């Protein structure tokens, strides 16, 4: 029996409790999603070719019979969160002459992003974001706040930078996992490329700074095969990669110099760094495009936070990303006014911001 109350203070208190508990237990939704990804639930439903019943799914996943009820409860939460959809299908257990139906589960747009082998699969993003190294550091946040040291939370918790962690043990697979996650995210850019073709039209050369294994550059090269593209990253990242006549891989240090080109692409780069280091990258980018005169440009793909957008889910994601960048790299996601100052301080004359990819922006910067 529910308690009744006419007091607004009590009602406010109950709503406050719900709000608090929801955020405290948000990790459960994240971990349930991680479990679904690791089990390959989306793959099974996709390969099934139609909505799948709970017994069929449990059988395909080779679960112990005692876990069928547990699977149902996981699916109940994930369905509530929009990752699966419930429907009904004719029951295989119906008696002769009787039509019976049972519940079945179908993919939704978010869970389709977990189907492995698809160009838009983001399973590696889930795996990387929820990796123990990304989560365990938060246990040290109280100590970190009280330290008089310029360390990231990751460094304070582990004793090493995230980049050192990635590179120290190639056999652990953490570097390849990170590169796979970045490549998966880059595939989403293919959808946006159709809308921003004009940004690359008229260019003869492009250097993708911090371009990793070249996921984005290859997409651009497919659309503009005449464009001479260079993927510029750390030597250990690009050292064993090969391209072709119009696509090459070059190792180096973006804080020292950047290969010359008509345009410099900085996708998911500047948010890794604080303003001082981002300014150095932008100044080196300006120098790299100087040979093109006023027709050169820098193309930034990053988040531009707009708390006044009215889209709470979008803004929350952007603010979450900001804390990820802060705690792991001492980087930041920037508001429009912060982008404006950074671009101006680097000596550029103008810029243009265009929202793309749902929660990111494409920022064209002109000398």
Swiss-Prot record:
Top class in the EC scheme: transferase
Biological processes annotated in GO: isoflavonoid phytoalexin biosynthetic process; methylation
Organism: Glycyrrhiza echinata
Record-linked InterPro entries: COMT-like, O_MeTrfase_dom, Plant_O-MeTrfase_dimerisation, SAM-dependent_MTases_sf, WH-like_DNA-bd_sf, WH_DNA-bd_sf
Induction: Up-regulated by elicitor.
Protein name, entry field: Isoflavone 4'-O-methyltransferase
Residues bound to S-adenosyl-L-methionine: 209-212, 233-234, 253-254, 267
Keyword Translocase: no
EC number annotated for this UniProt entry: 2.1.1.46, 2.1.1.212
Residues annotated as the enzyme's active site: 271
Pfam families: Dimerisation (PF08100), Methyltransf_2 (PF00891)
Similarity comment: Belongs to the class I-like SAM-binding methyltransferase superfamily. Cation-independent O-methyltransferase family. COMT subfamily.
GO MF annotations in UniProt: 2,7,4'-trihydroxyisoflavanone-4'-O-methyltransferase activity; isoflavone 4'-O-methyltransferase activity; O-methyltransferase activity; protein dimerization activity
